[in-house]
Amino acid sequence: MIREERLLKVLRAPHVSEKASTAMEKSNAIVLKVAKDATKAEIKAAVQKLFEVEVEGVNTLLVKGKTKRHGQRIGRRSDWKKAYVTLKEGQNMDFIGGAE
């Protein structure tokens, strides 16, 4: 069993993009920014506990940070982890339902 304190640190924010909204419509998957050291089991447990939905599967990927310039200085954004969480049939989760 994963401690509740860890579950709260696993999920960072929903990732809103055109690809994410297409994934939600076609395969009932939500896209989340998660902690870089989070495992698939931790992500699944956190989503099920915090949002009270049934999770079918979790796919993760590391997103490389972009190189950015500010004048002559060159910097790099941090790498981050993205998770595609597929919900079971009949389950629904709406992050932006109130924005109309």
UniProtKB/Swiss-Prot annotation:
Keyword annotations from UniProtKB, A to Z: Ribonucleoprotein, Ribosomal protein, RNA-binding, rRNA-binding
Gene3D superfamilies (alphabetical): 3.30.70.330
InterPro entries referenced in this protein's UniProt entry, alphabetically: Nucleotide-bd_a/b_plait_sf (IPR012677), Ribosomal_uL23-like (IPR013025), Ribosomal_uL23/eL15/eS24_sf (IPR012678), Ribosomal_uL23_CS (IPR001014)
Example of a GO biological process term: translation
Transmembrane domains' residue ranges: none
SUPFAM superfamilies associated with the record: Ribosomal proteins S24e, L23 and L15e
GO MF annotations, alphabetized: rRNA binding; structural constituent of ribosome
One cellular component (GO) term of this entry: ribonucleoprotein complex
Subunit structure: Part of the 50S ribosomal subunit. Contacts protein L29, and trigger factor when it is bound to the ribosome.
HAMAP family cross-referenced by the UniProt entry: Ribosomal_uL23_B
Function: One of the early assembly proteins it binds 23S rRNA. One of the proteins that surrounds the polypeptide exit tunnel on the outside of the ribosome. Forms the main docking site for trigger factor binding to the ribosome.
Name of the protein in question: Large ribosomal subunit protein uL23
Lineage summary: Bacteria, Pseudomonadati, Pseudomonadota, Gammaproteobacteria, Enterobacterales
